[in-house]
Structure formats: structure tokens, C-alpha cells
A protein has these predicted regions:
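Extended, hydrophobic alpha-helical segments in both membrane/secreted and soluble proteins
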Residues: 42-44, 51-52, 92
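Pocket-edge structural micro-motifs
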Residues: 22, 44, 64, 85, ...
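N-terminal flexible segment immediately upstream of the FAD-binding catalytic core
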Residues: 1-37, 49-79, 108, 131
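Charged, amphipathic alpha-helical interaction segments
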Residues: 27, 40, 122-125
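FAD-binding subdomain of flavoenzyme oxidoreductases
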Residues: 70-74, 80-169
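Residue-level detector of anion-binding/catalytic polar loops
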Residues: 40-41, 102
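Short, basic and Ser/Thr-rich N-terminal targeting/leader segments
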Residues: 13, 36-38, 45-47, 113, ...
């Protein structure tokens, strides 16, 4: 299996130390603790459709697309959808279309690229002049830091930004 994850759509190749396919966030927490204890790098990955080699490396490849691929919540009134990193745009848009919505970034790999990788790359596509890139459709993103703590990244108002700047490093 490590050979399958030694490359992406680029020409780069490096066999990872291991490959992990977490089924839930608890698996991720355990993995982060293990990697930290053993001083191993984690390489998050979804479909591996990028041409630049971002998901290739000698650490532990973490395939977030295999099992974490659900549309978690949709609120048409608030114009919000929450997805896991393994959701494919061509699976998301048919759910949004009856409500008059669209996830605009339409890459040439929209039938296999996954939202997690698209966020990491700020992907766009042939319609980006009209619909923008992923950052134009992203309100917040949630993840884990190397100490296992959960973090949400999103917009800050001026007071929140000042508080972050004044806080501990």
C-alpha cells in the first residue's frame, strides 16, 4: 500500500513511512499523539490529484478521503454546508443544485478531487473568473494542531484579531 501513496498526479515520488486511513476524529487524535511521540511528520492527503507533489513525502501519509467523505450538514437558509475532507465536488453539487446553490470551483478533476485537498491548494478552475477559488466559498475550516488540540480557522473582526496578536505565542 505504501507504493500506492508514494506519488500523486505529479512526477514526484517518495515512499512514506506508513499510510493511515482514519475512520473518524478519534483515530486522528491517536495518530497525532503517535506521530508526536515518535517525531514523525504527518502528510494529510485526499485524492492526490494535484500536480505539484504536496502529498508526497517520507512521513506518515494520512488518507483523509477514504472514510471521511460525508456531507455533514446543509442549511439552505444560512447558505451553509459542512463537509468532511473526502467529499468530491461532483457529489456535493447535485445536493446543492435543487436549492439554487453551487460550489463554484470547478477543477478539471471535479469528479475525483476532494474538498480537503482543494482547500489546501485554494483550487479554482475554468469558471474562477465568475465563481472564484475555494477561499471565496470557505467560511471556516477545522483541524488539529500537532499537540492534538482542535482548532477552527475563520475570519476575525478587528477586536478578535487584536486579542490574538496580544495573546501568548
Amino acid at each position: 500500500m505504501r507504493l500506492l501513496y508514494a506519488t500523486d498526479a505529479s512526477e514526484y515520488q517518495e515512499i512514506p513511512v506508513a499510510v493511515v486511513l482514519p475512520k473518524n476524529e478519534d483515530d486522528l487524535r491517536v495518530l497525532i499523539a503517535f506521530a508526536r511521540e515518535h517525531r514523525l511528520g504527518l502528510i494529510p492527503r485526499t485524492a492526490g490529484t494535484s500536480l505539484a507533489g504536496q502529498v508526497v513525502g517520507g512521513g506518515i501519509v494520512v488518507d483523509l478521503g477514504r472514510h471521511l467523505n460525508r456531507i455533514v450538514a446543509f442549511d439552505a437558509g444560512r447558505r451553509r454546508v459542512r463537509v468532511q475532507p473526502g467529499v468530491v465536488p461532483n457529489a456535493l453539487n447535485p445536493c446543492l443544485k435543487p436549492h439554487g446553490f453551487l460550489f463554484g470551483p470547478e477543477t478539471s478533476t471535479a469528479n475525483r478531487a476532494m474538498i480537503g485537498g482543494m482547500v489546501g491548494n485554494n483550487s479554482c478552475g475554468s469558471n474562477s473568473i465568475v465563481y472564484g477559488s475555494v477561499r471565496d466559498h470557505l467560511i471556516s475550516t477545522r483541524g488539529f494542531l500537532s499537540d492534538g488540540s482542535e482548532v477552527t480557522f475563520g475570519p476575525l473582526n478587528a477586536a478578535e484579531f487584536a486579542a490574538k496578536c496580544a495573546g501568548p505565542d
